[in-house]
Structures are given as structure tokens and as C-alpha cells.
């Protein structure tokens, strides 16, 4: 999708208030709890036996932080998401064989986490811009499959 100046402003201003470490851990943690089949990509992460184990797992938190950090890079390059994610796409698709559907799920979980954290500030308009953003990221990450 094409990002309007308004989309960019909306995404950037909310992103400035996001605690990448906290929100990253929560987003990846929720992904693994809500969509348990995604856990198979994280065999090396140790204890994922329950929701509380997952949410407290330091490796989940660390990778979640990494995920949102790369999302922050993307936010600086909304007009070239494909270029921004070329290497990550190669890694996740060619080497790890992650189903692209999982990128979409992660994006939806992130939107949920932002909604919880920002409450009323996360208006329908803000949600629309973010949904466009996570869809763009998912499709950029999946580009190796086409």
C-alpha cells in the first residue's frame, strides 16, 4: 500500500512513545501464546510450556525487542519496505522457512498490543495507518516467496 503523509505522521508520532523492549517482548510473547503453532520456530528458546513461562522467557523478550527494533528501521523507510527487509526476508523465508502468514499474525498482535497500551489515543484512524503499516511489512517480508 501507499503511505500518505498523514499515515507517516501518525505512525511516527505513536512509535516515538513505544517502549521497544516492553512492547516487543509482549508482542512476540502473545504471538506464541495466542497462535501456539508459531512456537515451532523457537525450539531453542527453552521453556514455552505455559503463557506465564512464555511471557517471562528472556529469549522471547530479547527476540521481541529485535523484531520491534527492525520495525523501527522500517518506519524510517516506509517508501522502501521491500529494500529494508530484503535481508530479513531472505533469512526468515529461505533459511528458516517461516510461513509468511506468521508475519501477518505478528502484525495483528502488535496492533492489539498498541491498542492496549495507548487506549483512547489509538483511534480508528491511527489503527488504520498501523494496519496498513504491518500489512506492508508482512508483504515485504514475504517477498522472497513470490
From Swiss-Prot:
Residues 2-146 form the Globin domain. Keywords: Heme, Iron, Metal-binding, Oxygen transport, Transport. CDD domains: Hb-beta-like (cd08925). Pfam families: Globin. PROSITE patterns: GLOBIN (PS01033). GO terms for molecular function: haptoglobin binding; heme binding; hemoglobin alpha binding; metal ion binding; organic acid binding; oxygen binding; oxygen carrier activity; peroxidase activity. Gene3D superfamilies: Globins. Heterotetramer of two alpha chains and two gamma chains in fetal hemoglobin (Hb F). PANTHER family: HEMOGLOBIN FAMILY MEMBER (PTHR11442), HEMOGLOBIN SUBUNIT GAMMA-1 (PTHR11442:SF52). This is Hemoglobin subunit gamma. The lineage of its organism: Eukaryota, Metazoa, Chordata, Craniata, Vertebrata.
Amino acid at each position: 500500500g501507499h503511505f500518505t503523509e498523514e499515515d507517516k505522521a501518525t505512525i511516527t508520532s505513536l512509535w516515538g512513545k513505544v517502549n521497544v523492549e516492553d512492547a516487543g517482548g509482549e508482542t512476540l510473547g502473545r504471538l506464541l501464546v495466542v497462535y501456539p503453532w508459531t512456537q515451532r520456530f523457537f525450539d531453542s528458546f527453552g521453556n514455552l510450556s505455559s503463557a506465564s513461562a512464555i511471557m517471562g522467557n528472556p529469549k522471547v523478550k530479547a527476540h521481541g525487542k529485535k523484531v520491534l527494533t527492525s520495525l523501527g528501521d522500517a518506519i524510517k523507510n516506509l517508501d522502501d519496505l521491500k529494500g529494508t527487509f530484503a535481508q530479513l526476508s531472505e533469512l526468515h523465508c529461505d533459511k528458516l522457512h517461516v510461513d509468511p502468514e506468521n508475519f501477518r499474525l505478528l502484525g495483528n498482535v502488535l496492533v492489539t498490543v498498541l491498542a492496549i497500551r495507548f487506549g483512547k489515543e489509538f483511534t480508528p484512524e491511527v489503527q488504520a495507518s498501523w494496519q496498513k503499516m504491518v500489512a506492508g511489512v508482512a508483504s515485504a517480508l514475504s517477498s522472497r516467496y513470490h
